[in-house]
Amino acid sequence: MPKHGKRYRALIEKVDRNKQYTIDEAAALVKELATAKFDETVEVHFRLGIDPRKSDQNVRGTVALPHGTGRTVRVAVITKGENVAAAEAAGADVVGSDELIERIAGGFMEFDAVVATPDMMAAVGQKLARLLGPRGLLPNPKSGTVGPDVTGMVRGLKAGRIEFRNDKTGVVHAPIGKASFDPSNLSANYGALISALEAAKPGTAKGVFLRSAYMTTTMGPSIPLTLSGGAQA
């Protein structure tokens, strides 16, 4: 196991490992645990009662965090026609059609999210799937990044809409803000994420859905969270 420094060990002492914290308690505690010289991201990690080997039990969805994530999201929009002006007006950072596809294929990656209109998806899939797919950036209707409403997609991403999905071990990792956030805003974002997760529970998943949860900052120790029984089948 890797050895932690004195700073980290001192932070661990502030967390009661025999306690499960309420979200309000944890949101207040992260203020004490975030001691890095930058504004640390606050994340939550949920272990789900699913079998990730079964495709019908995988969890994926999006949620609009009421107080955003605290980070600036650079959005690229692949579209054409009148949607170009709509995307620019909505605040997209880079907009284009076939020429943008070629630019990305050539190595341009100065964006954090990509959205596309349906009329561009054939070209996107053909030329960018292998490049964007492994990075989690390939536009997909399930993640709210493919559709005719360019304005809504761009504004949603800019305002703090995030995508969540389980990893191969059945755990969902998601940001809910920054350590500088007011604790009440972190709590509200957490509540929105919990609701979205429970709504995304697969019908084939049995028993307790939300098995365990932890909150952590970028450089800090994890805080065990209480779950009121979890979502049952």
Curated annotation (Swiss-Prot):
Domain of life of the native organism: Bacteria
Segment forming the signal sequence: none
Gene3D superfamilies cross-referenced by the UniProt entry: 3.30.190.20, 3.40.50.790
PROSITE patterns xref list: RIBOSOMAL_L1
InterPro entries reported in the protein's UniProt record: Ribosom_uL1_bac-type, Ribosomal_uL1, Ribosomal_uL1-like, Ribosomal_uL1/biogenesis, Ribosomal_uL1_3-a/b-sand, Ribosomal_uL1_CS
GO MF annotation list: rRNA binding; structural constituent of ribosome; tRNA binding
Any GO BP: translation
GO CC entries: large ribosomal subunit
Keywords, comma-separated and alphabetical: Repressor, Ribonucleoprotein, Ribosomal protein, RNA-binding, rRNA-binding, Translation regulation, tRNA-binding
HAMAP family xref list: Ribosomal_uL1_B
Function noted in UniProt: Binds directly to 23S rRNA. The L1 stalk is quite mobile in the ribosome, and is involved in E site tRNA release. Protein L1 is also a translational repressor protein, it controls the translation of the L11 operon by binding to its mRNA.
PANTHER family: 54S RIBOSOMAL PROTEIN L1, MITOCHONDRIAL, LARGE RIBOSOMAL SUBUNIT PROTEIN UL1M
Subunit structure: Part of the 50S ribosomal subunit.
Family: Belongs to the universal ribosomal protein uL1 family.
Name used for this protein in its record: Large ribosomal subunit protein uL1
